[in-house]
Amino acid sequence: MLSAIFSRFLSLKSTTLSVLLGFLLATEGTAQSTGPAYDAAGNILLPKGYRSWVFVGANLGLVYRPEIQAMTSREAARAETMAFHTVYIDPAAYAAFLETGTFPDPTVLVMEVFRGETRDADGALKEGTFPGERLLVELAVKDPQRPTREGSKENWAYYIFPGDAESDPLASAEAQPDSECFACHRSHASHDNVWVQFYPVLRERRRP
């Protein structure tokens, strides 16, 4: 894994390479994956160890305006539940983003969706909302070499892994139709199909 990642970044500046090297040293010997991986059917595999990737930010209770394309039936159902989103990016893509301000091929972003809770088991909380039960995991993947591209000419694909507190997410998932996630991201995400406007870690480094 180390040689494959370093081959992508031989031309990066030393400061950017330091970011990547620090991640690799911190995670050496643990079960990690970076970049997209697919099964024999062309479905994407849920990355291992993604919670140790670069955390780009979180948000609570985002609800799109009903008249815009983002409000699909799935988003409408999600809007009924106050939800936390926590987002991670694979370290190799983040190192490249620091250098160029753009998302390289490939890039993987993972978003966990949690139910917002206002009451803790011990009853200690007076006010506030915290992440409770996990509802699902979603992936945004920029990979022009991805399999199962029939009917799609887009570099970005989106995947949904159902899985709550009672069960682990599915091991693999197929790409959503372009008319669902991709169309919304293309219309409203601020930078290369990513909602960079919601995450200052990325927003401050993007380039036109």
Roles of regions detected by a PLM:
Residues 1, 15-16, 71, 82, ...:
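Detector for methionine-enriched segments
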Residues 1-11:
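N-terminal secretory signal peptides that target proteins for export/translocation
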Residues 11-26:
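Bacterial N-terminal signal peptides
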Residues 12, 96-97, 121-122:
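Generic hydrophobic-segment detector
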Residues 27-31:
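Sec/Tat signal peptide C-region and signal peptidase I cleavage site
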Residues 32-100:
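N-terminal secretory signal peptides
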Residues 35-39, 46-54, 58, 100, ...:
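Sequence context surrounding c-type heme c attachment/ligation sites in exported
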